Amino acid sequence: MNLPGPIHDFLLVFLGLGLILGGLGVVLLTNPIFSAFSLGLVLVCISLFYILSNSHFVAAAQLLIYVGAINVLILFAVMFMNGSEYYKDFNLWTVGNGLTSLICTSLFVLLITIISNTTWYGIIWTTRANQIIEQDLVSNGQQIGIHLSTDFFLPFEFISIILLVALIGAIATARQ
């Protein structure tokens, strides 16, 4: 946003305080529902930071994805679980946990070695030299699509895998 300097600075300080207070609420509040609402405040403040830095598409994506979907999913999972029954028979470490952590650690080490030993030169399909597009004619959404399919392809896939694992974990927790 093109705001005058003092108003922009005031909004930055106000949003920074909102982030700090919301983050403290996430960590320090004992009720998980209030903690999830504090997380929603933090995510809304982050999206407002994006609006202040003229990244309107990223701000809208932040609101839709994180506040609208992830935070609602967290609230649903917290409200779905009964805390007193969930921690009644809580064992710190079992054989299944050790086996699972061993398998996950070995898969992680295997993925890291495969990624570090792979030559990524031939994998990228398009390069910037082949794109003969005027920057003024391309919208922000198209620029984001171009960057996601070229420069940020691997991190984008990592994030999708992490979200898939989180979804499977939420389903497994809800079935218990």
Curated annotation (Swiss-Prot):
One of its GO terms (cellular component) is chloroplast thylakoid membrane. Pfam families: Oxidored_q3. Its EC number is 7.1.1.-. One of its GO terms (molecular function) is quinone binding. The chain crosses the membrane at residues 10-30, 32-52, 61-81, 95-115, 152-172. It catalyses: a plastoquinone + NADH + (n+1) H(+)(in) = a plastoquinol + NAD(+) + n H(+)(out); a plastoquinone + NADPH + (n+1) H(+)(in) = a plastoquinol + NADP(+) + n H(+)(out). It is a multi-pass membrane protein. InterPro entries: NAD(P)H-Q_Oxidoreduct_6, NADH_UbQ/plastoQ_OxRdtase_su6, Nuo/plastoQ_OxRdtase_6_NuoJ. It is an enzyme of class 7 (translocase). It is found in: Plastid, Chloroplast thylakoid membrane. Keywords: Chloroplast, Membrane, NAD, NADP, Plastid, Plastoquinone, Quinone, Thylakoid, Translocase, Transmembrane, Transmembrane helix, Transport. NDH shuttles electrons from NAD(P)H:plastoquinone, via FMN and iron-sulfur (Fe-S) centers, to quinones in the photosynthetic chain and possibly in a chloroplast respiratory chain. The immediate electron acceptor for the enzyme in this species is believed to be plastoquinone. Couples the redox reaction to proton translocation, and thus conserves the redox energy in a proton gradient. NDH is composed of at least 16 different subunits, 5 of which are encoded in the nucleus. Belongs to the complex I subunit 6 family. This is NAD(P)H-quinone oxidoreductase subunit 6, chloroplastic. It comes from Populus trichocarpa (Western balsam poplar).
